[in-house]
């Protein structure tokens, strides 16, 4: 294969792992990284485009690729306000999906366990709303991944998340049955699943929960 991909959120935890995998995978010939800063990964496959992420609609020609991997995401604490958070997790994703709708057949989005447009929690409500918006586009194949708390070496330190990870690792053995879906998951595992979903010859719109993601990678 000779696939071209756009990666959004490449400097994040999952995005960074994803780019490493794409660089090594012979199915991909070009990786377009759109953002404010480049990644610290050297490869002849990588094309970095410094773009205004708040005005992605001005860069729609960059979306003339086979697949868009959207790993955009922040926290309310990092963004400073709910409005700032929504600008990244909803508006930027919306603009990316609208650009992708014109060109690509596959769009793969990182969401969150518990995403629900009707949730009372602002974070989960926003994630649910962006899922709904993406699913309503005319993109032929959409995969939405809902990972639980992520394990990995994050450049951006999130103190609250650090506590959550420590607790999750302690609690993992007792999370059985229907509670298994709450177990933490390695960022690399999520990235591996994104590549698998892209290379599958499957059309349609799908949502994958954290445990499904884990099992997919284990069985491949």
Where are these regions (language model features)?
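SDR active-site strand-loop-helix element
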Residues: 8, 34, 71-72, 107-113, ...
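NAD(P)H-binding glycine-rich loop region in Rossmannoid oxidoreductase-like domains
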Residues: 5, 46-95, 99-102, 116, ...
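Conserved Rossmann-fold NAD(P)-dependent oxidoreductase catalytic core, especially the SDR/UDP-sugar
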Residues: 25, 82, 87-131, 136, ...
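Oxidoreductase cofactor-interface core, primarily capturing Rossmann-like NAD(P)-dependent enzymes
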Residues: 29, 117-217
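Short, polar loop motifs at secondary-structure junctions
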Residues: 33-40
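N-terminal Rossmann NAD(P)H-binding glycine-rich loop of SDR-like oxidoreductase domains
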Residues: 3-25
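Short, conserved active-site loop motifs that form the nucleotide-linked donor/cofactor pocket
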Residues: 45-46, 142
